[in-house]
Amino acid sequence: MERSNVVDLASAEHLIVVIPEADNSYYTNAQHLPHARWEDAITIDLPRDIATNFCIRQGREHVGISGISMGGYGAIKLALKHPDLYSFVGVMSGPLDITRRSPSLRRWSDDENVVDLWLFRKHPTE
């Protein structure tokens, strides 16, 4: 966080930014470990705790999820599994290819709002 402008941007836009650590959970509830319920922690416990401790706008239209690398995977996984919770999702350097692999993501492969910034930077004139 200290090497980015996230805090300044969040402050200017009156946003709450939460960065949870999900270990090597793949953002999934462990079947045999009741204390390792990562999906529930992020989709149930965390929003409840935020609403309890901060004055926030209610409703999915005010909630998004985002992540970098493995966190990007978790963000898209949870957003697709819980579309009632999130109105937007951001994936930065996430381990996925929305144009070829996942049928649930393929519907956005031709969406003009989806931009592959890595390809754009690599081939800006194409």
Tell me what each language-model feature is.
Residues M1-E126:
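Non-catalytic cap/lid and distal C-terminal segments of serine-dependent acyl enzymes
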